[in-house]
Amino acid sequence: MILTPTQADLDLFAELSGDANPIHVDPDFAAKSGFGRTVAHGAMLTAWLVRAAGLSETPSSTSAMFPAPAFAGEALVVVHDGEAWQLARQQDGVVVCRLLLNAPVPSEEFLVVSSEASLPLKLGMTRESETEPKADTFATLQGLQSRAGEKPLSGEAAQILAGQAYMLGLISTLLGMELPGQGTNYLKQETSWLGSIKPGEKVHACVTITRLRPEKALVDLSTRVQNQRGGILAQGRALVSARDVKGAF
């Protein structure tokens, strides 16, 4: 299967999730970044691979790594290596997303660094959001995901997968827009899925810094999504690069 993330796809996912990180939607900003041009959201690539896996049941966890950028307009090939699902650039074979399904997700622990006192970013820094999905958000996400699906899904399964994609988008938004901020590059996201979004409910997302590695411009964070009653829907951890985030280190 060949999937090509167009700039229109990136703009649409940014609109649906709120993640307007300029490395995805601003060609001028991206041209000055380490990428040189706009790149696809890791959350969107994950949503595509989950759909491409053709699962009979929705996953209990997703563990995605993004070892290289997926550029807007470049074709990607879906590959299954027996253990993981991958998206690789058709042009050079470089893997841009590697996904494990239903694997254990370790908890994130706080790790202190000796130079933290002098850093703008601090352990325990948190950013939160509260959103209520629009009525057509999940239908639009289902349409975007369906491009990666060779097998039809039941209405309930498609709704749950769209909800998971939406929650990944909320986490991505906090990382890419607030903490560390604009220019953030997603490297890894591990998520346990503990519940699903109910129509008409507000959703609360939260990310918290748990580790800083200034020598590599890396930031580890815990990630969580809850419903309006406080029930945990998603819990996990993220690893990002703040190389292109102004003033991060």
Per-region residue spans from a language model:
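HotDog/MaoC-like acyl-thioester-processing domains
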Residues: 1-2, 61-127, 197-249
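Hot-dog-fold acyl-thioester-processing enzymes
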Residues: 1-60, 106-184, 246-249
